[in-house]
Amino acid sequence: MTRPLLLLGALLLAACAGSPPPAAPAPAAAPSGPSCAAALARAGFVFEPAPDRDGPGDCRLRDAVRLSRSHVALDQPLLVSCPTAEHLLRFEADVVQPAAQRHFGQRLARIRHFGGYACRLRNGDTRAIRSEHALGQAIDIAGFDLADGTQITVARHWGEFGPRGAFLRQVAREACSIFHVVLTPRTDALHRSHLHLDIGRWRRCDA
């Protein structure tokens, strides 16, 4: 990946998840530990355990995995907590693949993302609360590639009236049944290029 794209991903992670959603706490996250890693292995995910991290500040990473491949290819490795990866597993199998078949008659081949774990506060603002990215509990999805090479990106296609826009909006709506918070271009300008999916304490669905 080129340096400009890496910088873009870093900036988007710094901007992600604006003010804390004023919603009721979400249910507990999926089980972690050996049972989580076993579920990923059974599903065919390619990953390796990642070391715990403490700090700086309130940042913390536990029971983490570095994914190099999920059910499909990833455009770059993804560092998240194992429970977050398990939610991604369900998201791909139960939401994205069926939506790709419905709108395009073919399978998903690749997920493009801007990252998972990042030690920072919301919006990169020192007055803000800790981001779920700082716990490895969030993923920023930039787009999807289909088996025939068709690319679908949030930045370009979210507002389209055709199948690519309909696909993205369906994926976002149905992600709300798996992830606790789903932020989209409907949320604010900071999310015009990606879907923020997290398993934090709060409930919010901006699909």
What are these regions (language model features)?
Residues 36-111:
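Active-site acidic/histidine clusters and adjacent loop/turn architecture
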